[in-house]
């Protein structure tokens, strides 16, 4: 598919034109780090991100065709901006029932959701992991049956949510059954909103697993996480049945939460990515996923030969193909210790916690990255002692968190209220102010407005959170 790159072409032409830059930015195109000649602002001909009529409009139209959406909008401020805009639009499109708006959301949500709730002043009813789940901060599998029950209960109470919000893929690579969840939402006329920050590439797999293709009403993608785009590049995607379709309204929602000085370096990167996606990217993506699947099988075969208590590489139908998630329990160590060992071998991971290590690959990783990783992991496997026990199932910790959770005030009241930082061990009974997170994965243990309980303290200590903000 032939693809234009209008933003890239305009900026390069301007950089070569010799025009006196009597406008922002202050570096005037003079190289300090090397990118400055291509760093411009919304000059004549450069279009406007939140009111495009020229090169940005053309580039977004290209992205829309590539993703097969009703409209794909650019963001230069990551999925965080898109999440806020998406929730604002869902609120705008929801029927008014005279009650406080409420969102039904899976508990493993990024803190951007809580910030949106504070800014837009809505409540959240949480979907929790089942008792059969393994027990991990990043995971919250939601079944169609669980969603049906939760939605039915809320509708019966006369408090239909303005949306259902799930994260898929999650930080550990788990994916939700989006088609099944979308069918449940459609039956109740509630939009399914997906934080697809880690899954922009899913559109370009042979089976097209992108949330919009699978029935979501809206979703956000962090292009920079899995596509060849610089940090900050993202998309807000709308399906044809999204609650708001008016382009001006959508751009207004993005502008509400965005800077009036969008980065043209990021816009050029998004624009250039269109040409990559229209080229041989799908073929290279298949090769990347196949290489990772081969690596998983090889590692798990070696782990089985060493009689490790669990597979080293997390695998299964509910795992996305382009993350390699390692279970450090297979090696008898913590995820953070495994990450340290990899770092000593010049392998930098995306995320590590007490049990797991997440490694993110893309088609841009050279073959030697796979080889080096496999060599190091096989060396670690060779040193595994005999008789390791299976790791303890931690689902009970999250069940206790759910049982003890009490919302003492709204999220908005907590985030905007007077607050103080206290050590975790002194926080019992206090009310959480700002979300308690480590970043990554930026997923809260205690939610703003909730009372800090013994279960919350135990989990915070397990995940290395030493202090938190509470209301005064």
Q: Where is each model-derived feature located?
A:
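N-terminal "arm"/small-domain region of PLP-dependent enzymes with the aminotransferase-like
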Residues: 1-54, 190
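Terminal helix/beta-alpha structural elements that buttress the NAD(P)+-binding lobe
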Residues: 467
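Conserved C-terminal alpha-helix-loop-beta "cap" of PLP-dependent enzymes
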Residues: 300, 304-448, 454, 459-463
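Conserved N-terminal alpha-helix of the aminotransferase class I/II PLP-enzyme fold
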Residues: 36-81
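Short active-site oxyanion
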Residues: 70-72, 99-103, 445
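Short, glycine-/Ser/Thr-/acidic-enriched flexible segments
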Residues: 29, 171, 224-226, 241-243, ...
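General small-molecule cofactor/ligand-binding pocket signal
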Residues: 73, 123-127, 350
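Conserved PLP-enzyme active-site core in the AAT-like
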Residues: 3-12, 78-312
């Amino acid at each position: 598919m032939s693809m234009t790159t209008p933003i890239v072409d305009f900026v390069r032409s301007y950089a070569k034109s010799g025009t006196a830059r009597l406008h922002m930015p202050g570096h005037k195109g003079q190289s300090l780090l090397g990118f400055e000649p291509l760093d411009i602002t919304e000059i004549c001909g450069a279009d406007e991100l939140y009111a495009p009529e020229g090169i940005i409009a053309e580039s977004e139209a290209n992205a829309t065709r590539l993703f097969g959406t009703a409209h794909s909008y650019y963001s230069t401020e990551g999925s965080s901006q898109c999440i806020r805009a998406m929730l604002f639009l869902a609120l705008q499109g929801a029927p008014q029932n005279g009650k406080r708006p409420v969102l039904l959301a899976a508990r493993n949500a990024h803190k951007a959701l809580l910030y949106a709730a504070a800014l837009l002043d809505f409540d959240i009813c949480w979907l929790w992991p089942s008792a059969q789940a393994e027990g991990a901060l990043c995971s919250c599998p939601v079944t169609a049956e669980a969603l049906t029950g939760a939605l039915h209960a809320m509708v019966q109470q006369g408090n239909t949510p303005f949306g259902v919000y799930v994260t898929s893929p999650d930080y550990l690579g788990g994916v939700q059954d989006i088609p099944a969840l979308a069918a449940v939402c459609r039956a109740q006329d509630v939009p399914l909103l997906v934080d697809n920050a880690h899954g922009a590439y899913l559109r370009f797999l042979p089976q097209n697993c992108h949330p919009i293709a699978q029935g979501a009403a809206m979703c956000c993608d962090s292009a920079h996480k899995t596509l060849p785009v610089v940090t900050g590049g993202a998309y807000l995607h709308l399906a044809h049945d999204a609650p708001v379709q008016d382009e001006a309204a959508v751009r207004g929602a993005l502008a509400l939460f965005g800077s009036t000085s969008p980065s043209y370096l990021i816009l050029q990167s998004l624009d250039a990515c269109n040409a990559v996606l229209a080229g041989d990217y799908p073929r290279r993506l298949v090769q990347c996923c196949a290489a990772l699947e081969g690596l998983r099988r090889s590692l798990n075969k070696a782990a089985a030969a060493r009689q490790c208590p669990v597979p080293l590489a997390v695998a299964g139908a509910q795992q996305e193909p382009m993350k390699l998630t390692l279970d450090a329990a297979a090696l008898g160590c913590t995820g953070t210790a495994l990450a340290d060992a990899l770092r000593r071998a010049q392998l930098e991971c995306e995320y590590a916690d007490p049990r797991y290590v997440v490694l993110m690959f893309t088609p841009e990783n050279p073959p030697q990255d796979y080889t080096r990783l496999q060599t190091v992991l096989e060396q670690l496997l060779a040193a595994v002692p005999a008789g390791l026990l299976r790791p303890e199932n931690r689902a009970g910790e999250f069940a206790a968190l759910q049982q003890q959770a009490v919302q003492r005030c709204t999220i908005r009241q907590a985030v905007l209220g007077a607050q103080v930082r206290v050590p975790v061990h002194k926080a019992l009974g206090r009310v959480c102010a700002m979300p308690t997170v480590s970043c990554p994965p930026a997923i809260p243990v205690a939610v703003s407005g909730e009372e800090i309980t013994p279960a919350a303290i135990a989990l915070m200590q397990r995940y290395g959170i030493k202090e938190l903000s509470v209301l005064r």
